[in-house]
From Swiss-Prot:
Protein name, per record: Mannosyl-3-phosphoglycerate phosphatase
EC number per UniProt: 3.1.3.70
Underlying gene: yedP
Catalytic residues (UniProt): 13
Gene Ontology cellular component annotations, sorted alphabetically: cytosol
Binding site for Mg(2+): 13, 15, 214
Family that this chain belongs to: Belongs to the HAD-like hydrolase superfamily. MPGP family.
Entry's Gene Ontology BP terms: mannosylglycerate biosynthetic process
Keyword Repeat: no
PANTHER family, per database record: HAD SUPERFAMILY HYDROLASE-LIKE, TYPE 3 (PTHR10000:SF8), PHOSPHOSERINE PHOSPHATASE (PTHR10000)
Organism of origin: Escherichia coli O6:K15:H31 (strain 536 / UPEC)
Chief subcellular location: cytoplasm
Places the protein is found: Cytoplasm
Key words of the record: Cytoplasm, Hydrolase, Magnesium, Metal-binding
Length: 271
């Protein structure tokens, strides 16, 4: 489909895609990460995680210095060499984490919606929920422009909750395991398009794009990619795109980093 020599950007979700949902292992993807690094092809991480959490993972994966998309697109961490861009080192879209917390606390107190946010608990509790170490769990609480929560109410009340958030200029987004509240103007698609445009401006040529994801909140990202890999995941809703042309979209048989590797194998061999 394309070669390792052509201008290319790879956008990848983390949990359930590049990382195993349970063990956080990424070794099955390691050979491809090395090949892409050697070919100077950026792998841009894109997740609901905080930028602090993602910078830690980015270094672990050998991707430090590259841009990344945090908090479902509400935060863009700029590449190290983009220091001349306004907002360096991070661009934040929409209202802040603190402002969203105020809205949620008001809705919970006055309209009695039932949910638990990451701000309601300590890092030990988050470590139990996620399987992370306490030090890593602490990084998940460093939100800048979103709130992560567990919904503990009915589907009917969720519909009402979403309607109220929309009225207030917010959106409710489902991840692989948790729900996320962020500004309605933010999104993985907008963030990815901004990064693509920046690379195009710097190089004078629009790069081909490949995106990989496994959850409903990855759909906006995959919609704006030239090619997309839908990694088999745990979420019952799955991922559904408007354009699922087999020439553009590949659904993997394997989960997590093995599915990630399968997707790369497919698009680099289908020529």
């Amino acid at each position: 489909m394309f070669s390792i020599q052509q201008p290319l950007l790879v956008f990848s979700d983390l949990d359930g895609t590049l990382l195993d949902s349970h063990s956080y292992d990424w070794q099955p993807a390691a050979p491809w990460l090395s090949r892409l690094h050697e070919a100077n092809i950026p792998v841009i991480l894109c997740s609901s995680k905080t930028s602090a959490e993602m910078l830690y993972l980015q270094k672990m994966l050998g991707l430090q210095g590259l841009p990344l998309i945090a908090e479902n697109g509400a935060v863009i961490q700029l590449a190290e060499q983009w220091q001349d861009i306004d907002g360096f080192p991070r661009i934040i879209s929409g209202i802040s984490h603190g402002e969203i917390c105020q809205v949620l606390n008001t809705l919970r107190e006055k309209e009695h919606f039932k949910f638990t946010t990451f701000d309601d608990v300590d890092d030990a509790t988050i470590a139990e929920w996620t399987g992370l170490s306490r030090s890593q769990a602490a990084l998940t609480q460093l939100h800048e422009a979103s709130v992560t929560l567990i919904w503990r109410d009915s589907d009917e009340h969720m519909a009402q909750f979403i309607a109220r958030l929309n009225e207030l200029g917010l959106q409710f987004m489902q991840g692989a395991r948790f729900w996320h509240v962020l500004d309605a103007s933010a999104g993985k698609d907008q963030a990815a398009n901004w990064i693509i445009a920046t690379y195009q401006q710097l190089s004078g040529r629009r790069p081909t794009t490949l995106g990989l994801g496994d959850g409903p909140n990855d759909a906006p990202l995959l919609e704006v990619m030239d090619y997309a890999v839908i990694v088999k995941g745990l979420n019952r809703e799955g991922v559904h795109l408007h354009d699922e042309d087999p020439a553009r979209v590949w659904r993997t048989q394997r989960e997590g980093p093995e599915g990630w590797r399968e997707g790369l194998d497919h698009f680099f061999s289908a020529r």
